[in-house]
Amino acid sequence: MILPAPHVEYFLLAPMLIVFSVAVAGVLAEAFLPRRWRYGAQVTLALGGSAVALIAVIVVARSIHGSGHAAVLGAIAVDRATLFLQGTVLLVTIMAVVFMAERSARVSPQRQNTLAVARLPGLDSFTPQLSAVPGSDAERQAERAGATQTELFPLAMLSVGGMMVFPASNDLLTMFVALEVLSLPLYLMCGLARNRRLLSQEAAMKYFLLGAFSSAFFLYGVALLYGATGTLTLPGIRDALAARTDDSMALAGVALLAVGLLFKVGAVPFHSWIPDVYQGAPTPITGFMAAATKVAAFGALLRVVYVALPPLHDQWRPVLWAIAILTMTVGTVTAVNQTNVKRMLAYSSVAHVGFILTGVIADNPAGLSATLFYLVAYSFSTMGAFAIVGLVRGADGSAGSEDADLSHWAGLGQRSPIVGVMLSMFLLAFAGIPLTSGFVSKFAVFRAAASAGAVPLVIVGVISSGVAAYFYVRVIVSMFFTEESGDTPHVAAPGVLSKAAIAVCTVVTVVLGIAPQPVLDLADQAAQLLR
């Protein structure tokens, strides 16, 4: 008997295949290209590959009719929601690669005429040699030689590939593989910080260990669900659950599965890794994780909830209610006490997870489209905020010495008004102030939740947003209305691409607050999951 080859829909998979091909090409470039050519080649591959993949997403989206198509024997669902999320991930990736590329070592006088390193103004957030012991002679020699980390670009593209497959997964086994593919490179990239190496490595280790535990819970949940339903496909699980009368094993499987998904989005009580990892990781990686990972993880959560779990609606909805309330409350209250800007933004991101869960709990088309819009708005604001935080350097202005201590930011907006205004815009968006994207996104998820009967959840969300405004405004007051001290940090001058990317984030944040209807319509059209 001849085993038939599976039919692979290459056209539908083109965006994902392009990203993985770029990642493989990046690995080959590291192996075979001379060191002096690697930086330019890696940046070109990452930016060009992401742009081509984004074009492929648009082309595939224009060819999709109806609810979408299943590919690779039903393992991948290519529908409008998948393509919307993949496009968002790729937009975030393009900006993240720009910020990663900007943080390159200063060129030493001995190497001015070589192409070994990028000629950028000392914005280096990455260690020159990961294998070197922090503070060792090997590390100092690498710094003097002007070495740069180029391995992070193929690592980032591998993670992006996993992020694109994760929300498209139509069976639990594919979802688990995608989860590991997106997570493993992130564990490594979190430990690449140039400054405070030990803090960075500690953050990477915490993320790795807790991520491994959450993956184990996820996999055990997959096993229990398979035992209860006899299938791994999400539509098959839905049909099997609808026909069952005893849901005890299935509920246990769903609970364990939820641990893995809620850990990845950073919901309470699975959020303990977020502040340490966000603070310890290089700031470009922090922004990348905070935006792209949430988009992918919430996409997977939406697919599981909306496709596989409708028969268990009455069981999972009260649990998500409690988790959303805890997440909004804990994230907001804890952020109030933070004196480090990166940790404050980390706890702020926890609170935003609660707001996004409000849209998921709505469990209706309005909730799905509102969640998609929220993810877009939040991604641009988050990338812009962390990009600016990464530009704030210690009073000596030295490369790698990022200064996120809020007490040092007094008068920063007076010294660098443009940077202060841009960061203020992102903070006001996080607070949900009108005429920013944050107001429209919060209004959309709260309205969807209220229409589904979750009025108490909306009340908690509104109160949390009001409290959160305090610590956002506190940063603005410190920058503009407090006299600068002697240790006020400097704002490093980024390159043209980084300036353009930050400007794009600012413009999108404002435009989505003033004229959000085109993106709201796009999110509404994308609110179709292949069932």
UniProtKB/Swiss-Prot annotation:
* Pfam families, per the entry: Proton_antipo_M (PF00361)
Q: Which organism is it from?
A: Mycobacterium tuberculosis (strain CDC 1551 / Oshkosh)
* Stated family: Belongs to the complex I subunit 2 family.
User: Mind telling me which InterPro entries this protein's record contains?
Assistant: NADH-Q_OxRdtase_suN/2 (IPR010096), ND/Mrp_TM (IPR001750)
Q: How does it sit in the membrane?
A: Multi-pass membrane protein
Q: What is this protein called?
A: NADH-quinone oxidoreductase subunit N
Places the protein is found: Cell membrane
Q: Does the keyword Transferase apply?
A: no
Which NCBIfam families would you find in this protein's record? NDH_I_N, PRK05777.1-4
Q: Which ranges does the record mark as transmembrane?
A: 8-28, 41-61, 81-101, 146-166, 172-192, 208-228, 250-270, 282-302, 318-338, 350-370, 372-392, 418-438, 453-473, 500-520
Q: Which keywords accompany this UniProt record? A: Cell membrane, Membrane, NAD, Quinone, Translocase, Transmembrane, Transmembrane helix, Transport
Annotated Gene Ontology cellular components are:
plasma membrane
What is the catalytic activity of this protein? Answer: a quinone + NADH + 5 H(+)(in) = a quinol + NAD(+) + 4 H(+)(out)
Q: What is its main location?
A: membrane
HAMAP family assigned to the protein according to its UniProt record, in alphabetical order: NDH1_NuoN_1 (MF_00445)
Has the keyword Ubl conjugation been applied to this entry?
no
Q: Among the record's GO biological process terms, what is one?
A: ATP synthesis coupled electron transport
EC number(s) per entry: 7.1.1.-
Looking at the record's lineage, which domain of life comes first? Bacteria
Q: Quaternary structure per UniProt?
A: NDH-1 is composed of 14 different subunits. Subunits NuoA, H, J, K, L, M, N constitute the membrane sector of the complex.
